[in-house]
A protein has these predicted regions:
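NAD(P)-dinucleotide binding in Rossmann-like oxidoreductases
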Residues: 220-223, 240-352
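A contiguous active-site-proximal alpha/beta segment in oxidoreductase catalytic domains
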Residues: 114-175
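C-terminal helix-rich "cap/oligomerization" subdomain common to oxidoreductases
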Residues: 1-17, 83-85, 307, 316, ...
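Rossmann-like dinucleotide-binding domain that binds NAD(P)(H)
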Residues: 177-253, 271-273, 372-375
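Glycine-centered short loops/turns at secondary-structure junctions
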Residues: 104, 131-132, 237, 391
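N-terminal Rossmann-like dinucleotide-binding module
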Residues: 1-65
Length: 401
């Protein structure tokens, strides 16, 4: 922690307009900066304050955006703060979320919701109380346009896939030996800190939560776990597989997701923040017509509320007869534009998450990603950790509410 002292109160931006939601950020790191960048470009949301345990970090980020800076325990004293965005290391998420909810503040929490299921349950119960503020978790894949397109194709034609498999060959260049990522007491471990993204996405596309999880882990000689393999069995025999390895330079990174619908379709998403989708569909005349109708307007097909298209998005269809009347092989390609880079797409997905929370606050409805979603993906991740430790398949905990 920096030795920089806190001023009595570091005053930055003026009061937001009456109808704007003032946003206070806890966590002045890289992800916190992404949240501020996304929030300041969202009409009706106004960043007002930055909090961090390190005064120097808080003041530096606050100064960059013209905001107030304060210690975390004083953020809720600011009457301008209506929404608390939490971007600290994971071990602080549950405590900060509970404090914000109990203080009547809405919460936008970076994943995971907690590192322990007991703490996640406390948050779940607080969020379920009558009149409770709204809470959502930053599951950016749910707000990615290619996942939105897949969801629409499933509803119109394909139904849930039979299998979901994610492969993450990731860089460790920014994860030095002392980084909190490697400390399971702080990060929760790979499946909790990072894997919940994909456990949630897999359950969302498969339309069910896993019934059984099995997993393996590999550690370096110094004890740091850098590789995790997990498999999940879903109701009806659907399967999901998750592989994470944080063990290579950035130039060798590679991530992809494979989807399979058995005899009817198969597909692949490229990038952990997906940039491209390829989908092969075997269909008949009505199925072809459904895909063509869905993709005629690509902006509608890829639409995510709060996500601003760049103009580089494209959807193309290639068609071939299967040699039988009315039977077709269809290849769909969709791209968000590789030149855009995953940074912009990630930031727009965060913006869409904030927009969804904003809409839920205005309507009184629940956001698209709820505390229950965050709880169940954490339960699956913890089941994977237990399975790796015991060598036995584990049933995830059941949602208590």
């Amino acid at each position: 922690m920096s030795g920089t002292p806190w001023p009595e109160w570091s005053v930055g931006s003026p009061d937001p307009p009456v109808d704007d939601l003032g946003l206070g950020l806890v966590g002045a790191g890289r992800f916190g900066a992404v949240i501020l960048e996304a929030a300041r470009e969202l009409p009706g949301v106004r960043p007002v304050a930055v909090a961090d345990r390190d005064p120097a970090r808080a003041q530096a980020l606050a100064a960059a955006y013209g905001l107030a800076a304060c210690p975390p325990d004083r953020l809720l004293d600011d009457p301008r703060v209506a929404v608390v965005a939490i971007a600290t290391p994971p071990d602080g998420h549950a405590e900060l979320t509970l404090a914000a909810l109990h203080a009547g503040r809405h919460v936008f929490c970076e994943k995971p919701l907690a590192t322990r299921i007991e703490d996640a349950t406390k948050v779940l119960r607080a969020a379920a109380e009558a009149g409770a503020p709204r809470l959502t978790v930053d599951y950016v894949l749910r707000r990615n346009p290619l996942y939105a397109l897949l969801g629409r194709l499933q509803r119109e034609l394909l139904g849930p896939p039979r299998s979901f498999a994610f492969e993450n060959l990731a860089s460790d260049e920014q994860l030095g030996p002392d980084h909190w990522f490697w400390d399971r007491q702080v990060s929760g471990g790979i499946l909790v800190e990072h894997g919940v993204h994909f456990l949630d996405a897999g359950a969302w596309l498969l339309g069910s939560q896993p019934e059984l999880v099995q997993a393996l882990e590999a550690a370096r000689p110094d004890g740091r776990v850098d590789t995790v393999l997990a498999g999940a069995l879903h109701p009806g025999g659907a399967t999901a597989r998750y592989a994470h390895a944080f063990d290579r330079p950035g130039r060798a990174e590679s991530q992809w997701t494979t989807l399979d619908w058995g005899a009817t379709a198969s597909g692949r998403l490229y990038g952990w923040i997906p940039l491209e989708l390829e989908l092969d569909v075997r269909t008949d005349g009505p199925g072809l017509a459904a895909v063509q109708a869905l993709t005629t307007n690509q902006q509608t097909a890829l639409a995510v509320p709060g996500y601003r298209p760049s103009g580089a998005e494209r959807i193309s269809l290639e068609l071939a007869s299967r040699g039988q009347p009315g039977q077709w092989d269809l290849r769909l390609r969709a791209t968000l534009g590789r030149q855009e880079g995953r940074g912009r797409i990630y930031r727009e997905s965060v913006r869409a998450g904030l927009a969804d929370l904003q809409a839920a606050i205005a309507s009184g409805d629940q956001p698209a990603v709820t505390a229950s979603d965050a709880w169940t993906s954490l339960a699956a991740a913890l089941a994977g950790q237990e399975a790796a430790a015991t060598g036995s398949a584990v049933r995830p905990a059941s949602l208590p509410l």
